[in-house]
Amino acid sequence: MTHSLIIEEVLAHPQDISWLPWAVQYFFFIGIAACAALFACYLHWRKKDAATEENRALLIAITCAITAPLALTADLHQTARVWHFYAWPTPWSWMPWGALFLPLFTGFLALWFLAQQIKRLFNKSYNVTKWLALASALCAVGLLIYTGREVSVVLARPIWFSYAFPVAMFLSALQAFFALMIVAARRDSVRLPKILWGQIWTLAALGLVVAMWVSGDTLSGTAIRQWITVALSAKYYAVGWVALWVCTLLFCSLALRHPLSQLRRVLLVLSALALCWLMRWTLLIQVQTVPKFNAQFNPYSLPGGTDGWLAILGTFGLWIALLIIIRETLNGLTRRLQHG
């Protein structure tokens, strides 16, 4: 009796990277926008008046909510076919939920922002505003769940396959939002210590979640540890995470004891934003270099064109421009109304 030897091999065609830097920008800005909307909704439904902080959070939310979809459309393949999500709904997939939540979130948020500015400029309020705030918050929750789960359900990438992924993405975006609120607040603001404590507790929760994720006896945790052991670049990114986390936490701790100068507040927000962005870059782009079938890593070099550095700088430039344009337009209207 003879036994034939069967050799099975997996052959894969070379292919371009699936997600481009545009996707990192989308996940970065939409996370901050969702956290800002949730915080603003909390302030709106409180009994205490916090109109200044609510308007500040709404400004952050609306500018990020405008920037994020533009980055997403640049990353999508065959953008003109986005209407297929609505013509042929597939509710068992996570991406169509994004096509539902994203326009609803942006629309409700824009109406809420306009209602707040009308109240601030003309002292005219609407009962529907609180429901716009609630609708924006619900859509924000949907966006946070969808953006986390559309990645963490991918079993083909074991590093992504974890419930810790969406939690870590949410907490990293929340601490970045708190940093933006800190840098925009007045030094004598009575609510500044509460925001500082909010960021400290968020950073502590983020550190705990990431530590449990990496050290856990799960498929994802094991894959992360193996990646750090084998790939030198993974070690560098891990060191970057820890360094930025420590720097941000240190700046927050110092701010509780002594008021930070404007320079240190800028360094705080840059450190927090860098931590939020680097986590997304590492998990969304660098994880794609981990091989599925072969025994070697797939090196990725960031190009300088519209799919590389230009995309990153352009979206940040757009966001800053929106902040300046909207803020100065509102300030100009305020001065004109005050002086007739």
From Swiss-Prot:
Gene Ontology cellular-component annotations: plasma membrane
Q: Which NCBIfam families match?
A: PRK14992.1 (NF011568)
Membrane topology category: Multi-pass membrane protein
Name where it's found. Cell inner membrane
Which keywords does this Swiss-Prot/TrEMBL entry list?
Cell inner membrane, Cell membrane, Membrane, Transmembrane, Transmembrane helix
> What's the source species for this entry?
Salmonella typhimurium (strain LT2 / SGSC1412 / ATCC 700720)
Supply the source organism's classification: Bacteria, Pseudomonadati, Pseudomonadota, Gammaproteobacteria, Enterobacterales
Q: What is expression of this protein induced or repressed by?
A: Transcriptionally regulated by Fnr and by the TtrR/TtrS two-component regulatory system.
Description of how the protein assembles with itself and partners: Probably composed of three subunits: TtrA, TtrB and TtrC.
| Protein name as it appears in the record | Tetrathionate reductase subunit C
Keyword Manganese found: no
Q: Name the residues that span the membrane.
A: 19-39, 57-77, 94-114, 128-148, 164-184, 195-215, 236-256, 266-286, 306-326
Function according to Swiss-Prot or TrEMBL: Part of a membrane-bound tetrathionate reductase that catalyzes the reduction of tetrathionate to thiosulfate. TtrC probably anchors TtrA and TtrB to the periplasmic face of the cytoplasmic membrane. May transfer electrons from membrane quinol to TtrB. During mice infection, the ability to use tetrathionate as an electron acceptor is a growth advantage for S.typhimurium over the competing microbiota in the lumen of the inflamed gut.
Annotated family? Belongs to the NrfD family.
List the Gene3D superfamilies.
Formate dehydrogenase/DMSO reductase domain
